Amino acid sequence: MDSIIPAGVKLDDLQVILAKNENETRDKVCKQINEARDEILPLRLQFNEFIQIMANIDQEGSKQADRMAKYLHIRDKILQLNDRFQTLSSHLEALQPLFSTVPEYLKTADNRDRSFQLLEPLSTYNKNGNAVCSTATVVSTNHSAAASTPTTTATPHANPITHAHSLSNPNSTATMQHNPLAGKRGPKSGSTMGTPTVHNSTAAAPIAAPKKPRKPRQTKKAKAQAQAQAQAQAQVYAQQSTVQTPITASMAAALPNPTPSMINSVSPTNVMGTPLTNMMSPMGNAYSMGAQNQGGQVSMSQFNGSGNGSNPNTNTNSNNTPLQSQLNLNNLTPANILNMSMNNDFQQQQQQQQQQQQPQPQYNMNMGMNNMNNGGKELDSLDLNNLELGGLNMDFL
């Protein structure tokens, strides 16, 4: 085979040699490949037979003669397997120059998606037990989706094994190195006896995976600061909740529960004179200012009629104080508006009763106010149930 295909031949030269077919070169190469292929099937059958014999080794007799016959039979099977392996190894060694052209063949445009990997670099040994090893190369190609060209790595054969009954496979020494107790263990039963341990003998240098960046450790000072911030936020939230809760409870306790009679007694004039409407509309401000001026005239007339500086309307002042305390623009509710309007109505009724009981010297000055009070009474007698409230803007109220 060396005369047909020299060692270190290139792919282009091999293609030229096979194309010319001088001295039947192509036929000889095909014959050598077929001979190596024909050795594979008998080797597999003989190896399966050996495994079956080793699996049934305990089922035969235990006499000395039976043991000797069993030993000789197993020895013959091992020697036959050894001869088969040596024959196949010789054929593969002869085809080694042809295998060396595989990496170049995979680099061509038509074969980039293919891969070839020689798992068992076999070689023969001489009668002294030393392996006769040629420069066999192991081809390993790894194809990736991103790479357009394959990556090939060629390394020389590993150190040969100097055991008489081994096939110079470097995997056996690797197995003994990784598992030093394998030779001390007893024989195993079942089909595991005689089964060789197949390892990937590719000598391609493994690519170390990049290490993940280590996360920065959080110092104790940073942890303490984070805990202090969390505690401060919790305290602020607790203080806000405690401040807002008593105000809401006191407001709810101070508000009276309106009854149907109280709601029916509310007049539109009293509602229009509330502080809320005075703030929102200029009409309400003018009305409230006129009411305040009239109230001042009434108080002056009462002061002149009584002849002393004492204020007879003590109930009015006492009623104005809770009204001002309950007035809070941030807590305006319909119940508060009704309560304020009812207090104003009650004060006007008390003022009218006191004016009727006491003499009024300034009749002309109070005539306008009496007319206004009489008009308020007429409006108070209106029935709100018969009013058209569909045109009112309830959102504004």
From Swiss-Prot:
Q: Which domain of life is it from?
A: Eukaryota
Q: Where is the composition biased (Polar residues)?
A: 166-178, 189-202, 290-303
UniProt lists compositionally biased (Low complexity) regions at 147-165, 309-322
> According to the UniProt record, where is the region Disordered?
147-227, 288-327, 346-370
Keyword Acetylation part of the UniProt annotation: yes
Q: Where does it reside?
A: Nucleus
Residues that bear N-acetylmethionine: 1
Keywords from the UniProt entry: Acetylation, Activator, Nucleus, Transcription, Transcription regulation
Q: Offer one example of a GO biological process linked to this entry.
A: positive regulation of transcription by RNA polymerase II
Q: Does the keyword section mention Cell cycle? A: no
From start to end residue, where is composition biased (Basic residues)? 211-223
What molecular function terms (GO) are annotated for this protein? RNA polymerase II core promoter sequence-specific DNA binding; RNA polymerase II-specific DNA-binding transcription factor binding; transcription coactivator activity
Primary location class: nucleus
GO cellular component entries: core mediator complex; mediator complex; nucleus
Instruction: Write out the similarity annotation.
Output: Belongs to the mediator complex subunit 3 family.
Please give the function described in this protein's UniProt entry: Component of the Mediator complex, a coactivator involved in the regulated transcription of nearly all RNA polymerase II-dependent genes. Mediator functions as a bridge to convey information from gene-specific regulatory proteins to the basal RNA polymerase II transcription machinery. The Mediator complex, having a compact conformation in its free form, is recruited to promoters by direct interactions with regulatory proteins and serves for the assembly of a functional preinitiation complex with RNA polymerase II and the general transcription factors.
Under the subunit heading, UniProt states: Component of the Mediator complex, which is composed of at least 21 subunits that form three structurally distinct submodules. The Mediator head module contains MED6, MED8, MED11, SRB4/MED17, SRB5/MED18, ROX3/MED19, SRB2/MED20 and SRB6/MED22, the middle module contains MED1, MED4, NUT1/MED5, MED7, CSE2/MED9, NUT2/MED10, SRB7/MED21 and SOH1/MED31, and the tail module contains MED2, PGD1/MED3, RGR1/MED14, GAL11/MED15 and SIN4/MED16. The head and the middle modules interact directly with RNA polymerase II, whereas the elongated tail module interacts with gene-specific regulatory proteins.
An additional note in the Swiss-Prot or TrEMBL entry is: Present with 556 molecules/cell in log phase SD medium.
Q: What is this protein called?
A: Mediator of RNA polymerase II transcription subunit 3
Q: Which organism is it from?
A: Saccharomyces cerevisiae (strain ATCC 204508 / S288c) (Baker's yeast)
